[in-house]
């Protein structure tokens, strides 16, 4: 099979569409909620806390702020947060795993 080298710029131009002012404002509002959610979860990250508890805090905060967790239910994903601890590469599920010092 022969590979062809091409500029990724052509591909990205097809994928990325300019946003309207309204879309930009929605993105800004969502980014603020995400930032505040991470800060809220960050308050309780400590040894002895489970990743399920981190998820509960995040989901509650998101919903209390009038938003919907985007990962929850997407392609069957069971949680509001993707939590990858230690050797979990990406998109880890929250569980009864108890955080330890150094995680």
PLM-predicted stretches and their roles:
Residues 4, 8-103:
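Active-site neighborhoods and metal-handling regions in enzymes and metal-associated proteins
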């Amino acid at each position: 099979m022969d590979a062809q080298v091409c500029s990724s710029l052509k591909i990205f131009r097809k994928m990325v569409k300019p946003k309207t002012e309204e879309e930009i404002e929605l993105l800004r509002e969502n980014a603020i909620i995400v930032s505040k959610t991470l800060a809220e979860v960050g308050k309780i990250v400590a040894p002895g806390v489970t990743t399920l508890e981190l998820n509960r805090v995040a989901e509650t905060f998101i919903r209390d702020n009038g938003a919907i967790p985007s990962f929850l239910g997407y392609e069957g994903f069971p949680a509001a947060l993707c939590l990858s601890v230690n050797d979990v590469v990406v998109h880890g599920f929250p569980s009864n795993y108890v955080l330890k010092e150094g995680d």
